[in-house]
Amino acid sequence: MSKWAEGRIVGNRQWTNRLVSLQIAAPEVGFVAGQFARLALPALPGSKESMLGRPYSFVNPPMQAPHEFYFNVLPEGPLSPRLARLNPGEPVWLLDRANGFFTIAELPASEALWCLATGTGLGPYLSMLRTDEPWEKFEHVVLVHAVRFAQDLSYSDVVAALATK
């Protein structure tokens, strides 16, 4: 059975007023690039649950610390605004195992890998493309990141580095 593992915020990057990346130092959470973890904070008073958790995709590759998550802040949401306000040193909880089948191993062999992302959907692709697996499995790798506004083009330095592969 999965348990909550306590981590600490080591970085909080506010890309825009609604796009945030959190870097979290936490006990090892085994995952495959493309998977997601549940992040949580203590539930607010009156809740039936002790923790309020939601799924967020890893942005970092499995061999890189700290864990990184990229998300939209939903102003009226119960969790994302609270996560966005966390400062370095503050606690956050992760479920001790990752989930999801959006991984390179699940893809059939082909000549090209097309990675089409909008907004924060870029996150799992960055996790995958920073491993060797897609570059060994596919002859061509194409990443498309579509956003509404230029200011929402996050991680341009990472994307530029990937373009040199």
Where are the predicted features?
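Ferredoxin-reductase
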Residues: S2-E90
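FNR/FR-type flavoprotein reductase catalytic core
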Residues: P78-K165
